[in-house]
């Protein structure tokens, strides 16, 4: 019998399954607006994911990227992770809505009792996304309503919720602005990050309760989680890279004492918080850039 570790009720366990995204959203926190490459296959990290399923009890799980629908292995992630947490209710795939023409993929996600979190980043995408959602759900007996949500920028917006047998199946949100990310500037193809007070930056981070699993290992946050992907494919200033390379991670096969200590400190600030801004300023995402920035 494995020891079970419980995350706080507000926390998200985020499985990052691809660096690739088809959009160019400025200030994307995981830098997927750049020419990022590589998808991850569930089979490569299956053992670690299954071990997390044995020892970790998260209140919420989100499969994300990048754009998860761009990963040809998405459904293997959906089915595989659902087997790891067969009874979890708040379990979603987060998408920008531009791949919803893949009706059978969406139905397969819904049939695994995950819900689809559609986060639109350009008003011009709305009509087509809604049409694809309604086509996807046409084979089910569904109901829908509208609520008011708040995103990580504290902006309020309408959420269109679709339910099957009382269970959330799709949420359509208009997220047309992002807050600042860890980029202070890009100069001569080098990404320079902030030098903030880490405590203040952490307190003001809207994603501080989103903990990332990347290549099967657990990280404090999105930036520490993607740091190897980022520094392998792009040039980051030397001071920031050095700090990122010191990021802690937790392998599910680590000694139980190490896992307990790591999870117990998940909600605390880390030295890498200094790389994010102390204050986040909202910026409209649209019109989206026509091509990804080459740096």
Which role fits each region the language model picked out?
Residues 71-209, 213:
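Conserved AdoMet/S-adenosylmethionine-binding subsite of the radical SAM
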Residues 44, 132, 258-261:
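Exposed alpha-helical structural elements
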Residues 182-295:
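Accessory C-terminal segments flanking Radical SAM cores
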Residues 9, 40-44, 73, 128, ...:
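Soluble or luminal CAZymes and related metallo-dependent hydrolases
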Residues 10-12, 113, 207-208, 270:
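Extracellular structured ligand-interaction cores
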Residues 1-95, 100-105, 112:
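Conserved alpha-helical substructure of the radical SAM core
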Residues 16-20, 29-30, 120-122, 216, ...:
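Short loop/turn segments at strand-loop or loop-helix junctions that form parts
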Residues 35-36, 70-72, 101-102, 124-128, ...:
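Short catalytic/ligand-binding loop motif for oxyanion handling, primarily in non-cytosolic enzymes
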């Amino acid at each position: 019998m494995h020891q079970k570790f419980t995350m706080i009720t507000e926390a998200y366990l985020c499985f990052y399954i691809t660096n690739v995204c088809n959009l160019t959203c400025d200030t994307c926190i995981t830098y997927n607006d750049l020419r990022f490459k590589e998808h991850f296959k569930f089979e490569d990290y299956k053992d670690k994911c299954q071990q997390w399923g044995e020892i970790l009890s998260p209140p919420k799980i989100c499969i994300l990227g990048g754009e998860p629908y761009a990963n040809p292995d998405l459904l293997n992630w959906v089915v595989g992770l659902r087997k790891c947490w067969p009874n979890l209710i708040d379990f979603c795939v987060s998408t920008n809505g531009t791949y919803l023409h893949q009706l059978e993929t969406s139905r397969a996600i819904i049939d695994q009792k995950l819900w689809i979190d559609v986060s639109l980043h350009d008003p011009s995408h709305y009509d087509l996304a809604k049409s694809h959602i309604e086509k996807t759900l046409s084979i089910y007996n569904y109901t829908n309503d509208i609520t008011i949500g708040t995103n990580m920028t504290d902006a309020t917006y309408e959420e269109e919720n679709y339910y099957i047998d009382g269970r959330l199946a799709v949420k359509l949100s208009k997220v047309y602005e992002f807050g600042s990310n860890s980029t202070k500037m890009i100069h001569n193809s080098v990404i320079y990050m902030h030098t903030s007070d880490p405590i203040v930056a952490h307190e003001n981070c809207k994603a501080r309760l989103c903990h990332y699993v990347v290549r099967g290992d657990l990280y404090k946050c999105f930036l520490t989680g993607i740091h190897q992907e980022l520094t392998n494919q792009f040039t980051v200033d030397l001071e920031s890279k050095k700090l990122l390379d010191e990021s802690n991670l937790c392998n599910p096969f680590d000694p139980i004492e190490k896992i307990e200590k790591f999870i117990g400190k998940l909600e605390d600030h880390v030295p890498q918080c200094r790389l994010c801004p102390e204050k986040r300023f909202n910026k409209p995402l649209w019109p989206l850039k026509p091509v990804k920035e080459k740096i």
